[in-house]
């Protein structure tokens, strides 16, 4: 079951939900075409203007290609979609491939070390102020999830590169879902607490090794996630 199907939805939002679900579950696979507008509106149970509005919105996100006088074609969203799809896909976690989270963590592992280096160089005192809270953070999965996100988005801001902030903002919905699972592991909380304190000490000493510390921890988090999913099998 996806993460939003039990919520009451407005007509346009309901249409979007039905269409996205139908793409992800293979009813309308990439490369296929949608039924005609009249037929599709009847199948979903909405008016044609409502359907048309939703189709254009989803087309703008990369799900469809709409050509006047031709059937609406379903795109390969992995190839045509943008970063904004991350927040949408987080609501349909049951449809994500098994290796999707690993790919996401690998992207973070590439981005975060240089971001941390810039943040430590630009705003060391502000970063220390956040990291100092790690000394008293409660041993709770949701609290760790919120703290870890606050640290990451703050580092993106302190990098003084607004593009990093935009990228990480698109990670938020996905991160909230995954972090709650990840930090259920005691080893993950213990590893992250050690990471925060190691970062704190390093920045206090000048921050020259911060990129190496973050890189090692990001790679370890991938291994921990693999262990978590392996135990679920």
Residue ranges and their predicted role:
Residues 1-110:
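Short linear motifs at protein or domain termini
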Residues 24, 28, 93-94, 116, ...:
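Short, flexible helix-adjacent loops and helix caps
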Residues 31-32, 128, 164-168, 211-212:
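Short, hydrophobic secondary-structure boundary micro-motifs
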Residues 36-37, 160-162, 205-206:
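Short loop-to-helix capping motifs
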Residues 79-150, 154, 194-216:
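All-alpha effector-binding/dimerization core of bacterial HTH-type transcriptional repressors
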Residues 107-123, 147-188, 221-226:
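Hydrophobic, amphipathic alpha-helical faces that serve as interaction scaffolds
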Residues 135-136, 169-233:
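C-terminal all-alpha effector/ligand-binding and dimerization domain
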């Amino acid at each position: 079951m996806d993460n939003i199907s039990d919520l009451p939805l407005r007509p346009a939002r309901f249409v979007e939900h039905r269409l996205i679900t139908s793409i992800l579950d293979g009813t309308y696979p990439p490369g296929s075409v949608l039924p005609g507008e009249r037929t599709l509106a009847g199948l979903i149970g909405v008016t044609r203007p409502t359907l048309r509005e939703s189709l254009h919105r989803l087309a703008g996100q990369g799900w469809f290609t709409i050509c006047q006088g031709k059937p609406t074609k379903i795109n390969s969203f992995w190839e045509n979609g943008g970063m904004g799809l991350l927040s949408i896909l987080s609501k349909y976690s049951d449809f994500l491939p098994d290796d999707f989270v690993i790919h996401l963590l690998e992207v973070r592992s590439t981005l975060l070390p240089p971001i941390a280096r810039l943040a430590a160089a630009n705003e060391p005192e502000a970063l220390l102020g956040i990291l100092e809270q790690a000394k008293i953070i409660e041993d709770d999965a949701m609290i760790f999830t919120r703290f870890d996100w606050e640290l990451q988005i703050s580092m993106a801001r302190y990098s003084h590169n607004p593009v990093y902030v935009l990228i990480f903002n698109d990670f938020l919905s996905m991160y909230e879902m995954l972090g709650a699972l990840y930090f259920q592991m005691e080893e993950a909380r213990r590893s992250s607490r050690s990471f925060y304190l190691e970062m704190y000490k390093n920045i206090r000493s000048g921050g020259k090794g911060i990129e190496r510390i973050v890189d090692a921890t990001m790679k370890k988090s991938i291994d921990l996630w693999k262990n978590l999913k392996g135990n679920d099998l």
